Amino acid sequence: TPIKSSAASDVYKRQVDNCYGEFVQTREPTEVGADLIAGSLIKNAGGGIATTGGYIAGRADLVEKCAYRLTTPGLGKEVGASLGHNRELYMGLFYAPHTVGEALKSAVYISALFSEFGYKTTPAYDAERGDIVQSLGLENEESLVAFCQGIQSGSPIDSFVLPEPWDMPGYDSKVVMAAGAFTLGSSIELSADAPIREPFYAWIQGGLNFHSAKICAMLAAQKMLEKGLLPNV
């Protein structure tokens, strides 16, 4: 997102929200023109280990200005809350490239599996990817709900929970979500959510390891099969 500088030079700074995109490709936005990137550590960059936090990276002078703005002028990065999580933050960053690879394999598998059933998948299983998000066009409300219930049933946390559509604040339609995660709100852990409206797309992201995500995908397909919702079967 270009942001107009308040400096007299009227230079434009390029800022990128890098959530879901870290470690997906061989180069990060700062290597292709971005001046500043930011993201969450309960997404890609935290490797499924960090339980909170975020990061800002890029041009040193801009990072320094951010540090002054977010803490105290003159103190910057020398102060600020780490909440005793430094070990988790650094370990998560260390594991992040591998964990993102597992999430990408999970997305490719889900795309390939459900394209075999005749559903529209974006990206396609063999397409180049810029982030870990996978979408499925499931065509109707019943299929969306069954899919999310199947994903939840294979999750490591709250697998007994049965997701149902509800009026979530901030949305103008009901939403169904599957998120059996160790860290609330984590999207590097496998989750799925869908607004209950046309064109009835589910959005899937994450997967700490491919094997567990594969089981979740198969359980989602099984749930839909039991309800007679799978075409081409």
What is each PLM-predicted segment?
Residues I42-S143, C216-V233:
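Active-site C-terminal subdomain of aminotransferase-like
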